[in-house]
Amino acid sequence: MYDINKVRADFPILSRTVYDRPLVYLDNAATTQKPLCVLDAMRDEYLNANANVHRGVHYLSQRATDLHEAARETVRRFINAPKTEEIIFTRGTTESINLVVSSFCEAFMSEGDEVIISAMEHHSNIVPWQLQAAKRGIALKVIPMDDSGKLDMEAYEKLFSEKTRIVSVAHVSNTLGTVNPVKEIVRIAHDHGVPVLIDGAQSTPHFAVDVQAMDCDFFAFSGHKIYGPTGIGVLYGKEEWLDRMPPYQGGGEMIESVSFEKTTFEKLPFKFEAGTPDYVATHGLAVALDYVTALGMDNIARHEHELTEYCMNRMAEIPDMRFFGTTEGKDAVVSFLVGNIHHLDMGTLLDRLGIAVRTGHHCAQPVMDRFGVPGVVRASFALYNTKDEIDTLVAGIKRVSQMF
């Protein structure tokens, strides 16, 4: 296990106060704070190696290109992808999913074809499919879940038909913390000859991800959820699928040759990377991945699992506490309501105590509909959080509860 005090010292923002109280940052499922090594690395590149990548023979361009492509290798190694050609840089998980949806549908789907998603998806894995449904006449089928937030795998198997073309599901629910059985989901889909896209935004920061062991066909995640910068994300895709999918956007860098008559496209991964990439952010992402690798993903998972269990046990002491997402082995998310206290009131009053939590539907309105509530309060944990902070949260909830 790592030294939590030493780790916290790596994150400058954790030492600040909010309303004259120490910051207790528990909104990590929305975005994580950044260690100084990431901030320093990005600043250093802007100061000493800022030039467009893949476009110049001069020193600065070559240096920036080297850092950018080294970041691609770092990502490949981190998720155990077979080839760097299968690592595509995007703006985030949302764009990664949209890339797959748009390009896959154009190549492989037509009117009447079906996609399977789950009842716990983030809007980013619902709306893009709905846009294609309106455009192409495809249909969405939804895997139901029980009251604990667990997917009904028997129902999942029954959703397949000769029209099923792809399965697209979250690895971990951003609202419930449910860790879905992705290996089984992939196996069942592959038994039907169907590829699988995994939304890894909420899994990648919390435990080791191995896309080869998972055998998924596509995997998406964001840099800012794993202590890296905003505006950078990753799409892993098996070469056999990416090769057959058309470009998502057109522009510079993704072309081989252009004339007024026709354009031919670059090989992977550049076919899907039109325009100037955020090459400083890719470097920042690589440094963030190296940071968590040095701490050990198993150590991070163990620490956050202890925090989650401790939080659930402490919060269970509070009268009229209602949890959303109670599956065994759930990830570092605790969503709740207390009595009739509105989630916005709870979040606003906790904020005045220096405690940052998320309130609302968490871009998962169908989940809220499933449980019959307009929104919930969500506390979500990271590698730098402590049991003392959870004690502060519990004390804050009790204090707010006494006001109603």
What do these predicted ranges mean?
Residues M1-F404:
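Pyridoxal 5′-phosphate
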